[in-house]
């Protein structure tokens, strides 16, 4: 049970802090799609790929006292900040998590805004389609986000960049 929880904790530890539930969902999904060992099931929802399993794991880690969740009122909505507690850090020190190196990848993902990660994860969700078909899906399913063709192209370049970071980290290890 705790293996998948520990992987999630390792991501948050590597990031230092993750601001936003949606952002954390997208970071894990993108990491999964670039062959990092995450196994949560994802379905397509309003904000792109979403995993109920991941939401439950986060809740469990908060309940166990391993993850600190801060609710902040920002404008007309609540925003959540996630970081490891001291107990979570202690747990990670004593739990041998089999993970490829991921710090550079996670730090880069964490630097991106949620809107862009939503686009990247949506592009990855439809990775079996041709680029033109993916573009049409984005324009249809994400019409309210008003993504441009340039942003979609940027998402493809970013996916290549993240895959490269993962490969570099594996070679360094």
Q: Language-model segments: what does each one mean?
A:
Residues 1-173:
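Domain-edge interaction signal
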């Amino acid at each position: 049970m705790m293996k998948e929880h520990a992987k999630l904790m390792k991501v948050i530890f590597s990031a230092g802090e993750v601001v936003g539930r949606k952002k954390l969902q997208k970071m894990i999904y993108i990491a999964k799609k670039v062959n990092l060992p995450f196994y949560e099931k994802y379905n397509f929802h309003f904000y792109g790929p979403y995993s109920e399993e991941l939401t439950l794991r986060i809740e469990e880690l908060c309940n166990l006292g391993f993850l600190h969740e801060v609710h902040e009122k920002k404008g007309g909505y609540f925003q959540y900040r996630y970081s490891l507690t001291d107990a979570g850090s202690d747990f990670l020190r004593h739990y041998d998590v089999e993970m490829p190196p991921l710090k550079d990848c996670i730090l880069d993902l964490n630097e991106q805004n949620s809107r862009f990660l939503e686009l990247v994860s949506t592009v990855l969700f439809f990775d079996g389609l041709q680029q033109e078909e993916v573009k049409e899906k984005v324009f249809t399913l994400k019409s309210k986000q008003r993504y441009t063709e340039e942003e979609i192209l940027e998402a493809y370049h970013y996916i290549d960049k993240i895959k490269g970071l993962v490969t570099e980290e594996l070679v360094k290890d």
